[in-house]
Amino acid sequence: MKRDKKEQVVSEVSEKLRRSQGIYLTEFQGLSVARMAELRNEFRKAGVEYRVVKNTLIKKALSDMEGADKLAPALKSTTAVAFGYDDPIAPARVITKFSKTNEALKFKMAAIDGVVFGSDKLPALSEMLTKTENIGRAAGVINNVVASVPMVVNAVMRNLVSVIDQVGKQKQ
């Protein structure tokens, strides 16, 4: 690869790294071309971009970012990067599901919002709720609280009326 082409790749990868909420490094050595195409298709369905990049070019692209030195140990052998733009957990789900039937795909490391996760954290990452799911749950809790306020007020009013009625009966 010529120098200007390498610089272009570094620039593109740097831009993708800046835009990504989640970055996942994988090893794909031993995956057939057909399996790799299948994996890319699964990533595409999940809204994730998956790209094979040389380790030296990834290192250069990461040099601008904080915590890049923590990802350096994972940049050995063949490396592909999964960029999670909208959902930082989507790549973890795809990798987990795909690696169950394809042992050649190996998760190396991930960085989500500057926090680095090792290969042992993939199961936990894949089970996390998405931002949308968390917002939905929070909205449901708030809705339940708001809906229960009138019931509590009605119960207090009913009890007050009952007490007043009892006092009135006692005075008669």
UniProtKB/Swiss-Prot annotation:
SUPFAM superfamilies: Ribosomal protein L10-like. GO terms for molecular function: large ribosomal subunit rRNA binding. Keywords: Ribonucleoprotein, Ribosomal protein, RNA-binding, rRNA-binding. GO terms for biological process: translation. InterPro entries: Ribosomal_uL10, Ribosomal_uL10-like_sf, Ribosomal_uL10_bac, Ribosomal_uL10_bac_type. It holds the Pfam family Ribosomal_L10. GO terms for cellular component: ribonucleoprotein complex; ribosome. The keyword Ribonucleoprotein applies. CDD domains: Ribosomal_L10. Forms part of the ribosomal stalk, playing a central role in the interaction of the ribosome with GTP-bound translation factors. Part of the ribosomal stalk of the 50S ribosomal subunit. The N-terminus interacts with L11 and the large rRNA to form the base of the stalk. The C-terminus forms an elongated spine to which L12 dimers bind in a sequential fashion forming a multimeric L10(L12)X complex. Belongs to the universal ribosomal protein uL10 family. This is Large ribosomal subunit protein uL10. The lineage of its organism: Bacteria, Pseudomonadati, Chlorobiota, Chlorobiia, Chlorobiales. The gene is rplJ.
